[in-house]
């Protein structure tokens, strides 16, 4: 039994890297509830406990349902900062020294939130993490698989204004019926713009 605890202790103390984290998916029930009140966004939950109960999902699509409910409460730059900063505090607790964060601009642009608002909130928290805790990071932008490829080109264009912050692009959201081949031209364009493709 002591060996088990010493192994867990060793793992907790060891420096770690998190290479695949979707920042919107890290939204905790408490922050979702708080932001829904602050931004006057209705969510289908009356309490933090109801949100927490909804987090017991059985597959990707059931996870995406709660994921998109959460994205709706993110409106202001400060919301994206708070979302990212809460994640960073968990990184510090788990001794994560480097993280690569994915984000979904299309989830927010469709609601009228500007690209600049999204990226600046996330980036500001990551810069503070480096300064305060020495946690390094990279940002990867994702395109939503369930949307048409054509709609992604405008998002890629907006990302060009933030080349200093975004190191690459990828895909996320519902995989069923949405293979990577659907985005062939988009990824060719991204590679021409010197974006890494993941």
Residue ranges: model-predicted function:
Residues 1-194:
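Metal-cofactor-binding active-site regions of metalloenzymes
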């Amino acid at each position: 039994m002591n060996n088990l605890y010493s192994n867990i202790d060793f793992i907790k103390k060891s420096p770690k890297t998190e290479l695949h984290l979707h920042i919107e998916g890290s939204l905790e029930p408490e922050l979702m509830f708080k932001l829904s009140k602050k931004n006057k966004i209705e969510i289908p939950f009356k309490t933090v406990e109801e949100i927490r109960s909804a987090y017991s999902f059985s597959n990707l699509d059931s996870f995406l349902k709660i994921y998109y409910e959460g994205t709706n409460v993110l409106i202001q730059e400060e919301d994206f900062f708070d979302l990212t900063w809460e994640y960073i505090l968990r990184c510090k607790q788990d001794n994560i020294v480097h993280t690569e964060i994915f984000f979904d601009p299309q989830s927010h642009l469709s609601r009228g939130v500007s690209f600049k608002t999204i990226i600046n909130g996330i980036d500001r928290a990551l810069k503070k993490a480096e300064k305060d805790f020495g946690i390094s990071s990279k940002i990867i932008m994702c395109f939503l698989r369930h949307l048409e490829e054509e709609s992604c080109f405008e998002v890629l264009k907006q990302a060009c204004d933030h080349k200093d912050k975004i190191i690459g692009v990828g895909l996320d959201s519902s995989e069923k019926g949405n293979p990577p081949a659907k985005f062939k031209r988009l990824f060719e364009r991204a590679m021409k713009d010197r974006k890494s493709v993941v």
